[in-house]
């Protein structure tokens, strides 16, 4: 069992790794994420664009599930948003949704899977 001093040290360590410049990410948003890819001794940024269908808030372990459809095949990836591999996060557009998880989009195809845009 952790004593209070150890727990405070762990909390301070977590706070040092949390990114503070992240945009407000909500379910249904279309994001463009820049992911750092290391190939040999070269490093580049690869962009991944898709819709946020799930979000799990857990301080430093906060994850988002992003879904995109590529050549008719749905692809989902889970990203740790505070990871050093995530170089950038840009919100392309906001959508009006009434669910906390959009897993039902997995069963929809084409125009049926579109979400209404929300203007802010």
Curated annotation (Swiss-Prot):
Primary site of residence: plastid
Keyword Chloroplast part of the UniProt annotation: yes
Record keywords, A-Z: Chloroplast, Plastid, Ribonucleoprotein, Ribosomal protein
Gene3D superfamilies for this protein: 2.30.30.790
Claim: Ribonucleoprotein is one of the keywords in the record: yes
One annotated Gene Ontology cellular component of this protein: chloroplast
GO biological process: translation
GO molecular function: structural constituent of ribosome
One Pfam short name: Ribosomal_L19
Subcellular location: Plastid, Chloroplast
Family: Belongs to the bacterial ribosomal protein bL19 family.
Protein name per its UniProtKB record: Large ribosomal subunit protein bL19c
């Amino acid at each position: 069992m952790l004593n209070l001093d150890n727990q405070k040290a762990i909390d301070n360590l977590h706070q040092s790794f949390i990114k503070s410049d992240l945009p407000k990410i909500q379910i249904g948003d279309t994001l463009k994420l820049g992911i750092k890819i290391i190939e040999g001794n070269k490093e580049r940024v690869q962009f991944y664009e898709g819709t946020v269908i799930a979000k799990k808030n857990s301080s430093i372990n906060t994850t988002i599930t992003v879904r995109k459809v590529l050549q008719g095949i749905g692809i989902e990836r889970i990203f740790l948003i505070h990871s050093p591999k995530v170089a950038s996060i840009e919100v392309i557009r906001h959508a009006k949704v009434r669910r906390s998880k959009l897993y039902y989009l997995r069963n929809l195809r084409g125009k049926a899977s579109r979400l209404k845009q929300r203007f802010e």
